[in-house]
Amino acid sequence: MSQASKRKHVVQEVLGEHMVPSDHQQIVKVLRTPGNNLHEVETAQGQRFLVSMPSKYRKNIWIKRGDFLIVDPIEEGEKVKAEISFVLCKNHVRSLQKEGHWPEAFSEVAEKQNNMNRESQPELPAEPQLSGEGSSSEDDSDLFVNTNHRQYHESEEESEEDEEEEEEAA
């Protein structure tokens, strides 16, 4: 199977399939990604541990901090105690909440994230302002400042002294 078709099937599986955790599986929240396809997660009970990403998800599905996962426990692991079996998107979270499979500890977190997403979206003004209205041409505070260049500040005293020296020399 080519890489493109593999990616297509993995993405369709994650986005389309509805997954309910079995008895041995659990829902966890991603806290951070230390690297090497490992993710630090927290359970609804507050237990923290590392989970590994299976090779079928690597370079196909991206997991970020705050995402929710369904994991299978690994008995022989000391630090890595589970393996990711499913990545939950927003639609999966909503359906699990409606069905009652969602942990109570995470329901508050999911609500806060939804509220933050709504608040972070900028509201558009009712009427667009024309370029001449309400703004002065002297106000450059909204311009991009390139921080990679040195800032040369010339004081007025130095420039007056330079002008006087040039006049005396001429």
Swiss-Prot record:
The record's Gene Ontology cellular component field reads: cytosol; nucleoplasm
Q: Where is the composition biased (Acidic residues)?
A: 155-170
Q: Which domain of life is it from?
A: Eukaryota
Family to which this protein belongs = Belongs to the EIF1AD family.
Where would you find this protein in the cell?
Nucleus
Q: Which UniProt keywords apply?
A: Nucleus, Phosphoprotein, RNA-binding
> Annotated Gene Ontology MF terms?
RNA binding; translation initiation factor activity
Question: PROSITE patterns attached here?
Answer: S1_IF1_TYPE (PS50832)
Q: What does this protein do?
A: Plays a role into cellular response to oxidative stress. Decreases cell proliferation.
- The gene name on file is Eif1ad
Q: Does the keyword Transcription regulation apply?
A: no
In this chain, the stretch annotated as Disordered covers 112-170
Q: Which organism is it from?
A: Mus musculus (Mouse)
Any Pfam family: eIF-1a
Protein name per its UniProtKB record: Probable RNA-binding protein EIF1AD
Residues recorded as bearing Phosphoserine in the entry: 131, 135-137, 155, 159
Instruction: State whether it acts alone or in a complex, and with which partners, per the record.
Output: Interacts with GAPDH and STAT1.
**Domain S1-like: from-to ranges:** 5-89
| Entry-annotated residues carrying Phosphothreonine | 33
